[in-house]
Amino acid sequence: MSESEYRSSISVRPTFNRTMQSTATYGSTISSGTSRTLKITEIGGSNLTSGMSPFGGHAASAIRESRTREKKEMSELNDRLASYIEKVRFLEAQNRKMEKDLNLLRGKWGHDSTSVKVMYETELRSAKDLIADSDKERAQLEDQIKKLVEELNNYRNKLHEAERGADVTRKELDNVLGRLGALEAEIELLKRRISLMEESIGHLKRENHRMIDSLHHARNAVEQETLNRIDYQNQVQTLLEECDFIRRIHDSEIHDLLAMASRDTTVENREYFKNELSSAIREIRSEYDHVSNTTRTDIESWYKLKVQEIHTQNSRNCLEQNYAREEVKRLRTTLGDMRGKMADLEGRNLLLEKQIEDLNYQMEEDMRSYEQSLNDKDTSINKLRDESKILMVELQMLIDTKQTLDAEIVIYRKMLDGEENRAGLRQLVEQVVKTTSIHQTKEIESLRVLKGETTSHSSYSRSAKGNIAIQEAEPSGKYIVLENISRRDENIGDWKLRRKIAGKREIVFTFPREFTLRAQKSVKIFARGQGVHSPPDSLVYDLEDSFGTGNDVVTTLYNKEGEDRASHSQRASHT
């Protein structure tokens, strides 16, 4: 066979696209203890990753599938090889019949060796050229992979910067929302104070109207007493005139008696009648003076007493009116200040709401741009990953081609070395079988339990129908605080405090008899061993170590008549 007639059978393997499927499967189940089960499937084997750790898993998946197909092809080739070996054995049996032809071939040994050498050198040059081209392509692919990795790192850095910016914006928004909540709470407090002041103003107005009515009644009483005084003065004048009339009558009678006495010539009779008349006159005068003095004294005393009462009532009414005027003036001033402050706070609240709207709009824009950049980066990353997978597959194919070529070169060398004996073909078959690579795949399942997070949500609500309110009910059941929101003391003796917990018994605390809660003060009721008994600021309930805890707790205050006066409810949920 001449050199020009020989053609090398070594060629570049045709490229083909392999479909890749991830071998890592994740399954999650939610257990009763709010835990999550994560199933991880790992792939192990002897696949070559060429040091590409970021894409090792995906490349291994592609190579595993290609190895599966190659294993199937290798099985078919093994079957073909087995049939070929049987054919070789048949040919070896025929070789015994072809010794004559072999002797002829041995006579032409030198010429045939030269032809085989030419064939070997031609194949070797082709293989070297192909290896050189493969090395060049591999270097180019490695450079491209480095550039892609650098670009991927840049995208990752930009992504981290965008995430940090989003975190900063989120923190600023949380701070603004916190300030807004504080301002809203302050506004609600001011509205509550204004409502309380308006109630106080209404109470003072009602008190003022009551005092004005009392003043009118007092004035009417003064006028009535004045009329009575005039009437009594008229009665006194009438009595005085009657006394004068009686005195004149008595004087006339005395004058008549004197005239009669003067007619009597007896000295003893004149003296007797004179003495009797003088005695009668003295008795009448003394009785008249006594009656007159008694009447005058009684009238003057009664008049002075009534005048003093009227003056006292008038002074008290004047003081109360002055106090009410001062209180109304002070409340109006405070109300004006509160309204001014409330207007300032409302303006500030509007400004903050405008800032929040601007920040929300800016945050939405940033989030949209951030999501768009994330989508673009994800698309770029997926594209780079696909390209990297393709490059890894092509690189693995080139490596496989190189290994196959190296194995074929070694086989040809051994074939030439073993041409002198009859076992050369058998060695060829054995080398082909020995160079077949076997890939094993094993699956490892690992069960990992991730403890879930627990979120607690609590809500409180309270109400009051009078001046006594339940200010606080400690969640762990250590104490309960009652508050007197009025400006006067409240007697809450024999009142009952009931605490109902879902699924548990009811706890009842009764206040001591004649217990008074002072104005604008509070009293704390401790469970046994949780505080100090110091009335009227604190009381201790000796019958219970705790007022109880639960997810649904209602605390209610009842007066002596069993009426609901205040309540406090607490509800908690856990997710």
Curated annotation (Swiss-Prot):
GO cellular component: cytoplasm; intermediate filament; nuclear envelope; nuclear lamina
Compartment list: Cytoplasm
Region (Linker 1): 106-119
Region (Linker 12) location: 258-275
Segments of this protein annotated with the region Head: 1-73
Entry-linked InterPro entries: IF_conserved, IF_rod_dom, Intermed_filament_ifa/ifb, Lamin_tail_dom, Lamin_tail_dom_sf
Annotated stretches, region: Coil 2: 276-423
Region Coil 1A, residue ranges: 74-105
Listed name of the protein: Intermediate filament protein ifa-4
Provenance organism: Caenorhabditis elegans
Gene: ifa-4
